Design a protein with these regions (language model features):
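Sec-dependent bacterial lipoprotein signal peptides
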Residues: 1-18
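Acidic, low-complexity intrinsically disordered segments
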Residues: 20-181
């Protein structure tokens, strides 16, 4: 009789400990230059966050655009031009908002404008204008793009790195080494 209870107890313990799933942690911090470097994305770079999204037809899609520098190679910059391409057969652009990083010391909205061709490309221009500083440096949030789904499917939003640029206050171009779209 004890052997039956012993076997049942053994099977119960085996079931409890054998059914545990160990998950691999995936960290998707867009401004983590070390994680970007491990993926072969050099700094400075432009990244989107979140990396992937699943939404229903009634949801909106919020995508943040970030600039990432390494701690030892931060260059001061004053303006950024981003050209972002997206699948207009799946999503439509709704709203573009300035990011918090490029606001001035008075926390006012930066010079922030965009052009949109009602197709699949949007150009964002943002400039740091401040009374105390000419440039800013660091890693941060440049813009938020809000899209609405128009049909189902999967595709990517990406930077056209050939058209993206970053400049200092003297209008000198700063090399962008990579993107993480």
């Amino acid at each position: 009789m004890n052997t039956i209870y012993g076997r049942i107890l053994f099977l119960f313990i085996l079931t409890i400990f054998g059914s545990c799933t160990i998950y691999e942690k995936l960290f998707d911090n867009p401004v983590d230059f070390k994680a970007n470097e491990e993926r072969g994305i050099g700094a400075p770079s432009f990244v989107f966050y979140p990396k992937t999204q699943s939404v229903t037809q009634n949801d909106s899609i919020l995508v943040g655009s970030f600039i990432v520098f390494q701690e030892d190679s931060i260059e001061p910059f004053a303006g950024v031009h981003l050209q972002i391409e997206f699948p207009n057969d799946l999503i439509e652009l709704d709203t573009i908002l300035p990011g918090l990083f490029i606001t001035d010391t008075n926390k006012s909205t930066p010079l922030f404008t965009y052009t949109y061709n009602n197709e699949s490309t949007v150009d964002i221009y943002t400039y740091f204008l401040d009374t105390l500083k000419q440039d800013i440096n660091g890693t941060g949030h440049l813009a938020d793009l809000i899209f609405n789904p128009v049909s189902s499917g999967s595709d990517s939003i990406y930077y056209n790195l050939g058209e993206c640029e970053m400049i200092d206050h003297l209008d000198q171009e700063i090399i962008v080494n990579g993107i993480r779209g």
